[in-house]
Swiss-Prot record:
Gene: AIM36
Chain segment of the transit peptide: 1-35
Keyword Iron: no
Family named by the database record: Belongs to the AIM36 family.
Organism: Debaryomyces hansenii (strain ATCC 36239 / CBS 767 / BCRC 21394 / JCM 1990 / NBRC 0083 / IGC 2968)
Keyword terms of this UniProt record: Membrane, Mitochondrion, Transit peptide, Transmembrane, Transmembrane helix
Name of the protein this chain belongs to: Altered inheritance of mitochondria protein 36, mitochondrial
InterPro entries associated with the record: P-loop_NTPase
GO cellular component, one term: mitochondrial membrane
Biological classification of the source: Eukaryota, Fungi, Dikarya, Ascomycota, Saccharomycotina
Length: 279
């Protein structure tokens, strides 16, 4: 018992005198980051707001530049006169001009009769237009002359179409009328104020639009009520009658159609009565 107590006291005394080595712990690499995260958590919000603000500015700039490029590539649908002149100068293109210039629009007037069965009506209308020089244009005569004169531009084409019984290409009648008007303007009579009266034309809306694009505006479309009602379908067929009626409707929409009431006895070929309500 005494020996056990002595050993215990010696052990305690030894522990007191023992030197305990000090171990230096290496700092963990995660400790500073963790500490920093905790220490700056409250300060993270302002950088996030700045980042979103900068992203908004950047995105807005990209959208603006992209939109500007698309707008530049988009073809313009309208020009001022100055812009058009600059465009013509830079591109080398010239705008399509009508045969009759704006300055000559008052000097030369154009009247069309989509369908007429008897030439007496054309004579009466020409008399009403007699305050100026009057030139009557018959597309059928122009086609015949062009076909028979092989020196003319469309002669062989018209010959082939006639042999094969094919319809005329779109715009050909208007081209022949344009050539005839151009020739007339270079004559002495063409220097005077002139009313042009074109019979049996236009008979499609395509020809009507081409005339106004290439030659001049139409002053009036004269609609012969009797012939349209009684002779048109009988002589031109249902489909052609429909096309000609569409022409009348086209001019009515632009307020350029003038209906002339003409009456005569159906059993008598001679014109007995005509009343003109004109312009």
């Amino acid at each position: 018992m005494f020996r056990s107590s002595q050993l215990l006291r010696n052990g305690i005394r030894g522990m007191r005198n023992a030197r305990i080595p000090i171990i230096q712990l290496k700092p963990s690499p995660f400790m500073p980051m963790r500490a920093q995260l905790y220490s700056t958590k409250a300060n993270n919000e302002p950088p996030k707001l700045r980042f979103l603000f900068y992203m908004f500015i950047f995105a807005s700039g990209v959208l603006y530049v992209t939109g500007s490029q698309i707008e530049k590539k988009k073809p313009k649908s309208s020009f001022t006169e100055k812009e058009f002149e600059e465009y013509e100068s830079s591109s080398g293109l010239k705008r399509r001009s009508k045969l009759i210039s704006t300055q000559d629009a008052e000097k030369y007037k154009f009247f069309v009769v989509p369908y007429v069965h008897q030439n007496e009506f054309i004579t009466k209308i020409a008399q009403k237009l007699g305050d100026k020089e009057v030139r009557i244009i018959d597309p059928e005569e122009l086609i015949k002359r062009e076909r028979e004169d092989e020196s003319r531009h469309y002669s062989y084409l018209l010959q082939d179409l006639a042999q094969e019984d094919k319809p005329l290409p779109k715009g050909l009648v208007t081209a022949l009328i344009k050539d005839d008007i151009k020739f007339y303007l270079n004559t002495r009579n063409g220097t005077f104020d002139t009313n042009f009266l074109i019979k049996n034309y236009p008979q499609t809306t395509d020809e009507a639009i081409k005339f106004e694009n290439d030659i001049s505006d139409i002053s009036k479309c004269i609609v012969l009520h009797y012939d349209m009602l009684n002779e048109l379908k009988k002589n031109k067929g249902e489909e052609n009658a429909r096309l000609i009626n569409n022409v009348v409707g086209y001019y009515e929409t632009v307020n350029k159609a003038k209906i002339i009431t003409a009456k005569h006895d159906e059993l008598d070929d001679k014109l007995q009565e005509i009343s003109l309500e004109f312009i």
